[in-house]
């Protein structure tokens, strides 16, 4: 926790964004140049998401990294 803000519960947003864009985990994993099980671990909150992956996801979904992390509502 930094400055009273929790950013360890971003993973539900990853799934919501993916589903809102009608994408499968496999499609997102291919975009990120990784295997689907690795992406699945991010989406389920089993692994911390690296900064470079976070940035690529924000670009893919045309949103901010702050939104993905739950720091803003858009």
Please identify what each model-predicted range represents.
Residues 52-67:
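DNA major-groove recognition helix of helix-turn-helix/homeodomain DNA-binding modules
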Residues 22-41:
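Short alpha-helical DNA-recognition segment
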Residues 1-20:
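A short, Lys/Arg-rich alpha-helix, primarily the initiator
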Residues 19, 30, 59:
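Alpha-helical residues within the helix-turn-helix
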Residues 32, 43, 61, 69-72:
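DNA major-groove recognition helix of helix-turn-helix
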């Amino acid at each position: 926790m930094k400055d009273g803000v929790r950013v360890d519960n971003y993973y539900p947003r990853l799934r919501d964004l993916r589903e809102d864009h009608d994408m499968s985990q496999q499609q997102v994993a291919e975009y990120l140049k990784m295997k689907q099980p690795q992406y699945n671990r991010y989406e389920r909150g089993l692994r911390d998401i690296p900064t470079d992956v976070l940035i690529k996801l924000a670009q893919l979904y045309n949103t901010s990294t702050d939104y993905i992390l739950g720091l803003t509502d858009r």
